[in-house]
């Protein structure tokens, strides 16, 4: 049987797309492999958010060129595909830089992958168009991959933040209909999925057609999904502060399937830098939004994204970011040094922050965020919480899952609990995971 190796870089959307490309190839008779050396088709599903991520792809392509040659010497053909946002942004440039690549395909065209692979027998192929048809209408049924699953409901972004390539690589905001999303969710649950994370570049800008033909909000969509039998939990990511509607806030208080966790990027605490980033909100507007969300769901866990060293950022600007982090308190966060991306307005600026200053600021920010994360996890010790068991744990007799607040937990229980929700008493907080015991385990130890 033919074998396909699919490697994904970057965001949850890419993870979803990688899985769907594997589904497309499976429908053509390819079995998935984790061993690139035995693959007849190698797909790199790429990320273009930061320069380092893009350069990793070219390093990997250099290694694949050698592998392709070695397999050819032993009589095996290998097709190499570059997909995702680097493919969309760089197109034919990839063919120039990486001679071993056979197919370059953008994120809106991967449903055509079988045809593109056939065409590549004759000539190298680039498809980075934004097709008129909806790719989701041409994708095969999804294969079950576990207890949790991503489900794309929205793609693209109209915000045009000054640092971001997404509007150029993913296009304008488009949303799937409520019916299409509910249908895919129902099939996921029938396959064993119990928690679904709704994903989009700007997921709370969701505006797919509802049952009456009128645009529905993300809150309305989650209400519809809560009626899917067997679905236990709902999450969503990534959101923009400017699209946070009242009904979405209300969903955190009224919909029992919506988990008390929110990833809401702010990027900076400085109003001057937020304006330069074209974020169209202030630090205080973000604070007020968080206050409203916490009023609706007091126990909600908050996560965010931060960029340090954006062009023109001063010590005073960075101090405002540190103040915002201190004011709000996060359970987790992602922070990065600014990386210029070609074609974005920020890349044209000449007031770059020195690399050494970026490094120093990032270290200070990450130290504060790490302290907040450790404090948040430590506060969980002694609490009783419901864990959705996702898989076996690191040690025999152990399983692993997540709290409603997206904290990883390890505890002793049989593998038969996978896919169920188990009450667990948290007994210890590690650096990245919590540890606990079931009520039965605690009683036995007493």
From Swiss-Prot:
Signal peptide: none annotated. [4Fe-4S] cluster 1 binds at residues 11, 47, 85. Its main location: cytoplasm. One of its GO terms (cellular component) is cytosol. Binds 2 [4Fe-4S] clusters. One cluster is coordinated with 3 cysteines and an exchangeable S-adenosyl-L-methionine. Monomer. Catalyzes the methylthiolation of N6-(dimethylallyl)adenosine (i(6)A), leading to the formation of 2-methylthio-N6-(dimethylallyl)adenosine (ms(2)i(6)A) at position 37 in tRNAs that read codons beginning with uridine. This is tRNA-2-methylthio-N(6)-dimethylallyladenosine synthase. It comes from Methylorubrum extorquens (strain PA1).
């Amino acid at each position: 049987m033919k074998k396909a190796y699919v490697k994904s870089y970057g965001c949850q959307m890419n993870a979803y797309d990688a899985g769907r490309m594997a589904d497309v190839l499976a429908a053509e008779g390819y079995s998935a492999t984790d061993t690139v050396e035995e693959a007849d088709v190698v797909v790199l599903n790429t990320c273009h958010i930061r320069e380092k991520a893009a350069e990793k792809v070219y390093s990997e392509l250099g290694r694949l060129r050698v592998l392709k040659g070695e397999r050819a010497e032993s009589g095996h053909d290998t097709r190499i595909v570059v997909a995702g946002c680097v493919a969309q942004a760089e197109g034919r440039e990839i063919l120039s830089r990486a001679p071993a690549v056979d197919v370059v395909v953008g994120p809106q065209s991967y449903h055509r992958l079988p045809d593109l692979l056939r065409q590549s027998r004759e000539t190298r192929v680039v498809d980075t168009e934004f097709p008129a048809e909806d790719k989701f209408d041409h994708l095969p049924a999804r294969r079950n991959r576990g207890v949790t699953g991503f489900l794309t409901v929205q793609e693209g972004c109209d915000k045009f933040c000054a640092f971001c390539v997404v509007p150029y690589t993913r296009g304008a905001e488009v949303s799937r209909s409520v019916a299409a999303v509910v249908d895919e969710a129902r099939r996921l649950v029938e396959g064993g999925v119990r928690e679904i994370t709704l994903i989009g570049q700007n997921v709370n800008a969701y505006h797919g057609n509802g049952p009456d033909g009128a645009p529905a909000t993300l809150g309305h969509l989650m209400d519809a999904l809560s009626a899917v039998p067997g679905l236990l939990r709902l999450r969503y990511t990534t959101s923009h502060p400017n699209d946070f509607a009242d009904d979405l806030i209300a969903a955190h208080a009224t919909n029992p399937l919506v988990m008390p966790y929110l990833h809401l990027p702010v990027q900076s605490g400085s109003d001057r830098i937020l304006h330069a980033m074209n974020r169209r909100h202030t630090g205080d507007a973000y604070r007020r939004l968080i206050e409203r969300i916490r009023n609706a769901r007091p126990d909600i866990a908050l996560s965010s994204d931060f960029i340090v060293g954006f062009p023109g950022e001063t010590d005073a600007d960075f101090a405002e970011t540190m103040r915002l982090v201190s004011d709000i308190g996060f359970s987790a966060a992602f922070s990065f040094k600014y990386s210029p991306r070609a074609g974005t307005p920020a890349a044209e600026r000449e007031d770059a922050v020195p690399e050494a200053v970026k490094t120093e600021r990032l270290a200070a920010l990450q130290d504060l965020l790490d302290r907040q994360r450790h404090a948040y996890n430590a506060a969980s010790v002694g609490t009783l919480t419901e864990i959705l068991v996702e898989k076996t744990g690191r040690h025999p007799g152990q399983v692993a899952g997540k709290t409603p607040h997206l904290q990883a937990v390890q505890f002793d229980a049989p593998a038969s609990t996978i896919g169920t929700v188990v009450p667990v008493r948290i007994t210890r907080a590690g650096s990245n995971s919590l540890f606990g015991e079931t009520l039965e385990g605690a009683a036995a130890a007493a």
